[in-house]
Amino acid sequence: MPKLKTKSGVKKRFKLTATGKVKHGVAGKRHRLISHNSKYIRTNRGTTVLAEADTARVKLWAPYGLN
C-alpha cells in the first residue's frame, strides 16, 4: 500500500498540541481592519483551538501528525 500524503493546506494552517487538540489562526485579519473596532482586532490575535467536530477531519488529512 502506498504512503499516505498529508494535505499541503493542512500543513500550512494547523498545528497539533501535545494533548491532541488542533490549533489554527483566526480568519479576517489580513486587510480592511480599519472597519473593525479595536476589541475585534485584539481578541482575534493569535490562535484558537479548533472545534471538536472539525478536529477528526483535520487529523484524517494529516495521517502522520503535523509537528
From Swiss-Prot:
Keywords: Ribonucleoprotein, Ribosomal protein. GO terms for molecular function: structural constituent of ribosome. Gene3D superfamilies: 4.10.410.60. GO terms for biological process: translation. GO terms for cellular component: cytosolic large ribosomal subunit. SUPFAM superfamilies: L35p-like (SSF143034). The keyword Zinc does not apply. Belongs to the bacterial ribosomal protein bL35 family. This is Large ribosomal subunit protein bL35. It comes from Rhizorhabdus wittichii (strain DSM 6014 / CCUG 31198 / JCM 15750 / NBRC 105917 / EY 4224 / RW1).
